């Protein structure tokens, strides 16, 4: 019996795949547990339409990520931070991914989820720093930060 997998089934198939499986297995397990449905012409047509719309949506997301990358990596787009600095040259506060995301929104109107900013640890130094950002699985960018001493 041909079935369309609705979810990943270990050892049998991934979501969206059309495969031939034994009749009893399909009826008694896959279809009962809503893991698959029978591959009728109508169901296959629906699947193809759904896959096309998902591909279109993925292409739109990729184009948007590339546009944001271009905007982030412009030379004049440098995030400005002013922090108090102690005698050892380290800032009193730290600059976290959340702060960077908020400043991007405030200074340039670019909304990025803080989880996409790849900061190993909060920044506590002054100067020019580049921080990597994962905008899409295929698109990475660098945010330029300029951290100044508030006493200057």
Curated annotation (Swiss-Prot):
<dbReference type="Pfam" id="PF03948">
    <property type="entry name" value="Ribosomal_L9_C"/>
</dbReference>
<dbReference type="InterPro" id="IPR036791">
    <property type="entry name" value="Ribosomal_bL9_C_sf"/>
</dbReference>
<dbReference type="InterPro" id="IPR036935">
    <property type="entry name" value="Ribosomal_bL9_N_sf"/>
</dbReference>
<dbReference type="GO" id="GO:1990904">
    <property type="term" value="C:ribonucleoprotein complex"/>
</dbReference>
<dbReference type="GO" id="GO:0019843">
    <property type="term" value="F:rRNA binding"/>
</dbReference>
<keyword id="KW-0687">Ribonucleoprotein</keyword>
<dbReference type="InterPro" id="IPR020069">
    <property type="entry name" value="Ribosomal_bL9_C"/>
</dbReference>
<comment type="function">
    <text>Binds to the 23S rRNA.</text>
</comment>
<dbReference type="InterPro" id="IPR000244">
    <property type="entry name" value="Ribosomal_bL9"/>
</dbReference>
<dbReference type="InterPro" id="IPR020594">
    <property type="entry name" value="Ribosomal_bL9_bac/chp"/>
</dbReference>
<keyword id="KW-0699">rRNA-binding</keyword>
<dbReference type="GO" id="GO:0005840">
    <property type="term" value="C:ribosome"/>
</dbReference>
<keyword id="KW-0689">Ribosomal protein</keyword>
<protein>
    <recommendedName>
        <fullName>Large ribosomal subunit protein bL9</fullName>
    </recommendedName>
</protein>
<comment type="similarity">
    <text>Belongs to the bacterial ribosomal protein bL9 family.</text>
</comment>
<dbReference type="GO" id="GO:0006412">
    <property type="term" value="P:translation"/>
</dbReference>
<dbReference type="Pfam" id="PF01281">
    <property type="entry name" value="Ribosomal_L9_N"/>
</dbReference>
<dbReference type="InterPro" id="IPR009027">
    <property type="entry name" value="Ribosomal_bL9/RNase_H1_N"/>
</dbReference>
<keyword id="KW-0694">RNA-binding</keyword>
<dbReference type="InterPro" id="IPR020070">
    <property type="entry name" value="Ribosomal_bL9_N"/>
</dbReference>
<dbReference type="GO" id="GO:0003735">
    <property type="term" value="F:structural constituent of ribosome"/>
</dbReference>
